[in-house]
Amino acid sequence: MTSLQSYSELELLNILISMCTSNKFPNVDNIFFQEGYRIVSIDRSVTTGSGSVKYDLVLSSQNKNLTLCFELKGLKASNISKEQLNRYKGLSTEEYIRLAGIQANNAINHKLQTIIGINLENLLKTEEYQVREGYNFPILSFGSQTISISFKELNDSEINQKLIKTVSTIGTPPTFIHFDKESRMSDLAYRAIPKIYSYAKVGTTMFTVEQIVNDVYCSVKELHSIIGPDVKKAVVNKIKSLLRQMSKEEFKDYLSWNGKDKCWVISKIHVESHHTTDFAFQKAGRNFIERLDKEIPFKIDKDVLQGQLSLFDELEPLDIN
């Protein structure tokens, strides 16, 4: 089995989250939780004197007076930016922990370290890039069998030793956050369509956008509140677009928008709906997802003139902070 595997940034994020949970999963060691780290933020922008800073994941330990900030570069790691790394290089620890709301026993002596997370196959070129451009960030590399630290040691000697010895990972870790800005519409549909069906089969024939976003986006409610609002807004907009398209295409007989109550209404499918009706709904789901995967064009909404709003544009605003 090769140790090389290309993970997306979202997959890298989920692997790291699994290393921070109280539950130890068979395929990933929860070393950050064991050492007292807790997740502070996920994809959240913080405006500092050196510009806007947005780490993919921020962990902090009050007992160790130390914060670890991860910049993840998935797949080919081709989006490493000098501007971004310069911002991290010149970041004031005291200013950042204050603006980010990080609890520190001693803010003056608190240490903050930026770590670049990449796929193992990109380790050599990332090391060469750092040498060439004058950066000195630790690199956390992810393979299908190992997770290891290189280039520079971490400020936390216990974590550093565990990572130098390598943390093993086999298979795919649990998924906590299911979407990000780069997720395809079909990724959302794979989770949203079965959820809509499950609503109806337990007697819930109306649902809000907020309800389905909460149910399909993030599996852990505690994490939902610390995800950056711009990322959540992008997911909300994709969910809205998905529901609109469903109601105009394969699901036009099953899904409609109730402008008065600001909710979506499920038709035909319910607790006692006939199995042939249920099968037809499920078939519509497969056809819809197949069209998304194959990028087959959908119909244009001819009822809305250019520059005008449709009734779907008045979907309820969500609290995404």
Enumerate the language-model features and the residues they cover.
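A short acidic, leucine-rich amphipathic alpha-helix
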Residues: 209-217, 223
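Phospho-regulated, low-complexity intrinsically disordered regions of nuclear gene-regulatory
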Residues: 256-321
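Acidic-basic catalytic patches of nuclease active cores, encompassing PD-(D/E)XK
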Residues: 1-52, 61-63, 95-100, 309-311, ...
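Short alpha-helical segments that sit at the start of domains
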Residues: 165-206
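Short amphipathic alpha-helical interaction segments
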Residues: 224-247
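Conserved catalytic cores of phosphodiester-cleaving nucleases, focusing on short active-site segments
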Residues: 44-79, 85-88
